[in-house]
Amino acid sequence: MDQYSILGRIGEGAHGIVFKAKHIETGETVALKKVALRRLEDGIPNQALREIKALQEIEDNQYVVKLKDVFPHGTGFVLVFEYMLSDLSEVIRNSQRPLTASQVKSYMMMLLKGVAFCHENSIMHRDLKPANLLISSTGHLKIADFGLARLFSNEGDRLYSHQVATRWYRAPELLYGARKYDEGVDLWAVGCIFGELLNNSPLFPGENDIEQLCCVLRVLGTPNQKVWPEITELPDYNKITFKENPPIPLEEIVPDTSPQAVDLLKKFLVYPSKQRISARQALLHPYFFTDPLPAHHSELPIPQRGGKHSRQRMQPPHEFTVDRPLHESVVDPSLIQKHAMSCS
């Protein structure tokens, strides 16, 4: 930590506190994510390891936040990221007026390029939401927070946790307890983000898992085997029943938007995961090639971070004093690299 000067605190999450800092020698501004270990014998948290592994796999992409360095510090370690000014949730929340059609197209294009790159590198993010889409001082959007990311294969026989993704952006198969799923969970989240950009408010703001499922069913209609053949195979399918409910036309859910936008939204928000449009296919949709065209990044709003950060605040396991010098770490640097490459 001696090579960095701490400029302030950005926020905190389940496994770390994030600080704005400046590299003393180069003057570069970065974000430092300090991950503390609850107990040394527990080892490095899986979410932190997944974040390191995912970003190592992706390497350098202009639509994914860059991991610059990882080093041990005290009873934990520090991830060094490029510094980003704000996030998309701040853009939505602080907009004095709804985003223009061209601004929405620009954000969606950057998001889809990042998601396409992740999926083409066999990485599911599993927690796409506006707060995890960071915005630079030049208006560029980059995907961040890979703590729930996993490598996937097309064989489809691997089991994953269904307790992933923030509730409002959680795919219906996850709400029904699916343990076998694919990158379609990210594509559902992209659709939810798209709808939120169009409406300036969340599409499915459920307060608990059951209400979340009700929000989805209210719009898309009650699923059956005709529209979703795999639904009866989902673990929680028989645990709760819903009355028959016809779908509401998406034109009524996102009024005052173009037919092309509604058509693309429909292609994300479908029950069968395999039927959701891929990120790469979505980039070729007529929506992006009809007027108004996507805005230049210089035309996008650049919000300042507010006093309260939009990420969920959680109590850190140990207090971390940035001013206290720690010349030796109890975490072996080689273990970070070793575990990161083996974690999946």
Swiss-Prot record:
Ribonucleoprotein found in the keyword field: no
Originating gene: cdk20
Compartment(s) where it occurs, according to its Swiss-Prot or TrEMBL record: Nucleus; Cytoplasm; Cell projection, Cilium
Keyword Cytoplasm: yes
UniProt family annotation: Belongs to the protein kinase superfamily. CMGC Ser/Thr protein kinase family. CDC2/CDKX subfamily.
Enzyme class: transferase
Catalytic residues in the record: 127
Protein name, entry field: Cyclin-dependent kinase 20
PROSITE patterns assigned to the protein according to its UniProt record, in alphabetical order: PROTEIN_KINASE_ATP, PROTEIN_KINASE_DOM, PROTEIN_KINASE_ST
InterPro entries to which the protein is assigned, alphabetical: CDK (IPR050108), CDK20-like_STKc (IPR048002), Kinase-like_dom_sf (IPR011009), Prot_kinase_dom (IPR000719), Protein_kinase_ATP_BS (IPR017441), Ser/Thr_kinase_AS (IPR008271)
Description of how the protein assembles with itself and partners: Monomer. Interacts with tbc1d32.
Biological process, per Gene Ontology: cell division; cilium assembly
Domain Protein kinase: 4-288
List of residues binding ATP: 10-18, 33
Keywords noted in UniProt: ATP-binding, Cell cycle, Cell division, Cell projection, Cilium, Cytoplasm, Developmental protein, Kinase, Nucleotide-binding, Nucleus, Serine/threonine-protein kinase, Transferase
GO function terms (MF aspect): ATP binding; cyclin-dependent protein serine/threonine kinase activity; protein serine kinase activity; protein serine/threonine kinase activity
Role of this protein: Involved in cell growth. Activates cdk2, a kinase involved in the control of the cell cycle, by phosphorylating residue 'Thr-160'. Required for high-level Shh responses in the developing neural tube. Together with tbc1d32, controls the structure of the primary cilium by coordinating assembly of the ciliary membrane and axoneme, allowing gli2 to be properly activated in response to SHH signaling.
Enzyme Commission number(s) from the entry: 2.7.11.22
